[in-house]
């Protein structure tokens, strides 16, 4: 919706925004009686192809773009849908373990726990919670991931909060924790979020640096950590941008009125160079 809505604004053609908005509403209207949505839906029939409700991959951008459509276009319906989904997530998926906040994958119709595994992609969610007004939970969830980072140096792709062990030992040079730290810092300017961002950046330099750039890791539990041989495209679009904006205080960016897409594209808040 943010990208398609922006395209409609730039071209003057409302079809792009209407199509994206229609798809978001279609998913929301098929939510369960618990107000949860699942990870997979048949786009032709509208039937669910999964029973799993998660804040991680397959659902993460849906929640993010509901809020973003409110932030970017003042779409009150998207704000309402975001609020309904978030209340349901906090009611049915929120889990506290050893004073750390996590979010279980649950059956979207019964609320029964399906998995206690978290994928690294979900670590963005603390920032989104903060944006939506649940700053206490957003801060707590980000701190939970920061503790995992402290344990392994860099985040594993999968982590089971029930066993406190990685379920996937790779690291894909992902930016989500830095994203959350930057988003939370924009909200309250706490130095803690800069500290988490700094540790994320320094760990990347230490472990992911290769002779000609940066690469993902094959095993974050190995000593020393074992590198793979791949640099994903989102690293260029997101990662370095979050680090830079978190510390640069650049006059080129409006730190109070801005919007970055899920791929880190600045759709609002970029200022011209002053002559």
Residue ranges, per PLM feature:
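Glycan-recognition and catalytic cores of secretory/periplasmic carbohydrate-active enzymes
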Residues: 1-275
